[in-house]
């Protein structure tokens, strides 16, 4: 605004959790917006900071992940159920810092009969009927060999009706070698976590960057 005064704004989306592996492990989601002023005591004029765009890229990857996790189905069922997913990812890079993804999920949620409210379910549910299939799209933010990603999918098949027709997954991936990628992610149902999964992926680069 003036030689010594400036205005700044910020926003944040936070999730706070007690970090428990067993229920209750509910978290709190908060949205924070802020605005303030700063006074700069130095007499020199504030330097102008030039913004730089990340180098453009147009390479393509296929990444296949096999993930495994365990979780408690609900607050009143203290059993721990195995879960996992086979995820096929198609990534197209926009720059050295970002990429888009699309693909298909094959999900096994061991606690599904007890996490979802199905009064008609009585007795044992076969493992095959605890499987789900879906398609998804997502966004990746790349920091060297590590990336943070958010994906939103829609169910195409399920024997047990999930609580919502769409599901989010968010997590972190790290490139271990040129072809192997580690995965840590949360499979959720809107703002409710269903299970945390760890996995290993294989990367197939089929188009090199030409920019």
Model-derived segments and spans:
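Residues that define the transmembrane beta-barrel architecture of outer-membrane proteins
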Residues: 27-33, 58, 80-86, 129-133, ...
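Glycine- and aromatic-enriched membrane insertion/assembly motifs of diderm outer-membrane
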Residues: 80-132, 136-140
